[in-house]
C-alpha cells in the first residue's frame, strides 16, 4: 500500500511540475508561453461595428435574421463563453463586437464577418448568363432539379461535421459530408459534369489556394455522400471548417467602425486583486495549520496544487479572465478550503475515538464525502443554469464566463481535496509521525469537542 501511495505521490508531483511549466512562461516564443488572457474590463481590447446588408430581407424577418447573425458570430468566436467576447445588436442593422486583448490579428477580424457560404459552379457556355469570372473562365451556379424544384449546390447542404485532414502525401484536405438533399444534388451534378471542372466560390470571389490559383477540381467520379476540398493552406482550411460548422451568416456584413478600447479597471486592479488573493490564501493556510496541524499543512500544499492546476486549465482552454471570471475562481477556492475543513473535522473525530491514523483517514474521508458531493453537485447544476442563461441574453458573456470558471475550479477542488490531500495523509500511515496525535489535533483523547 505504501509503495502504491508513493507512486501516486510521484504522479501528483509530476502533474504539479507540468502545470507549473504551463502557468509560468509568459514569453510568446516559449512552449505554451502565452500568458493568461484578461478581458476587456481588465486589459482593454477591440470595439468593432458591422453593418448588415438587409436589402433582400423582408421587414417582418429582420429581427430573426439579426438574432441569427448574433448567434453565428458568437459560435465562431466564443463557443464556450470563456473568451468574454461581447456581441450585441445596435439598432435594426448593426452588430457591435467587443474582443478582449490588444493583439487581435487580421485573420481573427476576418473570421467575424465572413459569410462562410461556399457555392459550387460550372463553366458557362458562350452566350450564357454567368455569376462569376476568373482566370479559368466564366461560371454559373451548379444546379439540379429534385422533385420539380431547382436547387443550387452550396455548403448550406453540408452536415456540421467538416474537418481538416491530410492525404498520404501530406496535402491539406477540407473534408465534408452532404446531408440528404446535398447528396442527391451532388450525385446529379457530378454525374453531369464528369471530366469537367467544378468551381468553388465564396461570395463574389473564387476560393483560391496558396498559389492564388482558383480551386476548380476536375470531377473524376460521381460524388454522393462526402467529398474533400484540396489546395487550401492549413490555417485557411481550419478557419473555414470552424466557420462552416458554426453556421453561415444569413446576410453579408460590412465592417464600418473599429476602435481600440482602454481597460475600465486596468493593471492597478489586477495587481491589487493578486495581492489581496495572496494575503487571503496565506491567512487561510495559517488558520488550517494552527487548527488542524499536519493535515492543515498538507491541505495548504494541496491548495497550492489546486491553484496551479486551475490556472493551467485557464491557459489551455483558454479562459479569458474578467471580474466575473475572477469571482468564479475565488468562490471555487473557498469551496476547496471548505471541503478540506469538512474532511479534517471528521478525521479529528475519528482519531479522538482511538482509531489509528489509517482507519481515521479512510473513515473521515468516507463520512465527509457525501456532504462534499452534495454541495459540489448543487454547484455544478447552478453552473449549468448560469451557462444556459448567459447564452440567452445579449450581454451574457460574463455570466457564462463565471459559470465556466466556477465549474472548472470546483471540479479541480474535488480532485485535490479527495485525491491529493488523501494521498498525502496516507504517506504518514504506519510511520512514527503518524502515531503522534498532537500533530493531527489540538485536543486529546477522552475530551469532547
Curated annotation (Swiss-Prot):
Function in brief: Part of the Sec protein translocase complex. Interacts with the SecYEG preprotein conducting channel. SecDF uses the proton motive force (PMF) to complete protein translocation after the ATP-dependent function of SecA.
The residues that cross the membrane are 6-26, 272-292, 294-314, 317-337, 379-399, 401-421
List the GO cellular component terms: plasma membrane
Keywords annotated in UniProt: Cell membrane, Membrane, Protein transport, Translocation, Transmembrane, Transmembrane helix, Transport
Subunit description: Forms a complex with SecF. Part of the essential Sec protein translocation apparatus which comprises SecA, SecYEG and auxiliary proteins SecDF. Other proteins may also be involved.
For this protein, the record's InterPro entries field holds:
Acrflvin-R, SecD, SecD/SecF_arch_bac, SecD_1st, SecD_SecF_C, SecD_SecF_C_bact, SecDF_P1_head
Q: Which GO terms describe its biological process?
A: intracellular protein transmembrane transport; protein targeting; protein transport by the Sec complex
By what name is this protein known?
Protein translocase subunit SecD
Q: Please verify whether the record's keywords include Cell membrane.
A: yes
Q: What SUPFAM superfamilies does UniProt report for this protein, alphabetically?
A: Multidrug efflux transporter AcrB transmembrane domain
Q: Which family does it belong to?
A: Belongs to the SecD/SecF family. SecD subfamily.
A GO term for molecular function:
protein-transporting ATPase activity
Native organism is Dehalococcoides mccartyi (strain VS)
* Cellular compartments annotated: Cell membrane
Q: List the disulfide bonds.
A: none
* Gene this protein is translated from: secD
Does the entry feature the keyword Cell membrane, yes or no?
Answer: yes
Membrane topology label:
Multi-pass membrane protein
Where this protein primarily resides, as one coarse class?
Answer: membrane
Amino acid at each position: 500500500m505504501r509503495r502504491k501511495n508513493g507512486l501516486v505521490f510521484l504522479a501528483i508531483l509530476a502533474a504539479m511540475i507540468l502545470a507549473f511549466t504551463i502557468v509560468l512562461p509568459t514569453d510568446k516564443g516559449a512552449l505554451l508561453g502565452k500568458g493568461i488572457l484578461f478581458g476587456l474590463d481588465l486589459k482593454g481590447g477591440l470595439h468593432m461595428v458591422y453593418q448588415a446588408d438587409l436589402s433582400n430581407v423582408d421587414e417582418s424577418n429582420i429581427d430573426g435574421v439579426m438574432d441569427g447573425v448574433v448567434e453565428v458570430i458568437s459560435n465562431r468566436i466564443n463557443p464556450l463563453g470563456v473568451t468574454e467576447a461581447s456581441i450585441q445588436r445596435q439598432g435594426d442593422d448593426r452588430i457591435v463586437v467587443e474582443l478582449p486583448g490588444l493583439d487581435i490579428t487580421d485573420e481573427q477580424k476576418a473570421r467575424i464577418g465572413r459569410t462562410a457560404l461556399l457555392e459550387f459552379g460550372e463553366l458557362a457556355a458562350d452566350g450564357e448568363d454567368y455569376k462569376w469570372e476568373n482566370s479559368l473562365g466564366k461560371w454559373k451556379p451548379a444546379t439540379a432539379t429534385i422533385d420539380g424544384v431547382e436547387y443550387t449546390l452550396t455548403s448550406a447542404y453540408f452536415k456540421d461535421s467538416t474537418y481538416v485532414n491530410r492525404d498520404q502525401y501530406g496535402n491539406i484536405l477540407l473534408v465534408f459530408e452532404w446531408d440528404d438533399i446535398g447528396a442527391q444534388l451532388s450525385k446529379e451534378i457530378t454525374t453531369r459534369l464528369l471530366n469537367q471542372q467544378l468551381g468553388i466560390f465564396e461570395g463574389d470571389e473564387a476560393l483560391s489556394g496558396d498559389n492564388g490559383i482558383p480551386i476548380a477540381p476536375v470531377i473524376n467520379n460521381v460524388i454522393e455522400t462526402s467529398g474533400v476540398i484540396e489546395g487550401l493552406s492549413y490555417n485557411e482550411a481550419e478557419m473555414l471548417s470552424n466557420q462552416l460548422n458554426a453556421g453561415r451568416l444569413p446576410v453579408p456584413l460590412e465592417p464600418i467602425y473599429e476602435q481600440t478600447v482602454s481597460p475600465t479597471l486596468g493593471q492597478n486592479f489586477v495587481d491589487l486583486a493578486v495581492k489581496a488573493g495572496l494575503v487571503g490564501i496565506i491567512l487561510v493556510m495559517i488558520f488550517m495549520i494552527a487548527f488542524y496541524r499536519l493535515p492543515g499543512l498538507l491541505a495548504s500544499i494541496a491548495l497550492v496544487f489546486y491553484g496551479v492546476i486551475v490556472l493551467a486549465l485557464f491557459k489551455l482552454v483558454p479562459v479569458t479572465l474578467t471580474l466575473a471570471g475572477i469571482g468564479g475562481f475565488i468562490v471555487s477556492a473557498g469551496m476547496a478550503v471548505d471541503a478540506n475543513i469538512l474532511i479534517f473535522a471528521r478525521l479529528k473525530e475519528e482519531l479522538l475515538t482511538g482509531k489509528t491514523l489509517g482507519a481515521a483517514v479512510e473513515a473521515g474521508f468516507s463520512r465527509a464525502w457525501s456532504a462534499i458531493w452534495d454541495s459540489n453537485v448543487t454547484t455544478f447544476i447552478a453552473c449549468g443554469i448560469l451557462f444556459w442563461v448567459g447564452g440567452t441574453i445579449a450581454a451574457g458573456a460574463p455570466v457564462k464566463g463565471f459559470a465556466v470558471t466556477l465549474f472548472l475550479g470546483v471540479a479541480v477542488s474535488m480532485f485535490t481535496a479527495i485525491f491529493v490531500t488523501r494521498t498525502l495523509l496516507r504517506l504518514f500511515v504506519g510511520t512514527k509521525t503518524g502515531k503522534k496525535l498532537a500533530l493531527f489535533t489540538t485536543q486529546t483523547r477522552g475530551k469532547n469537542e
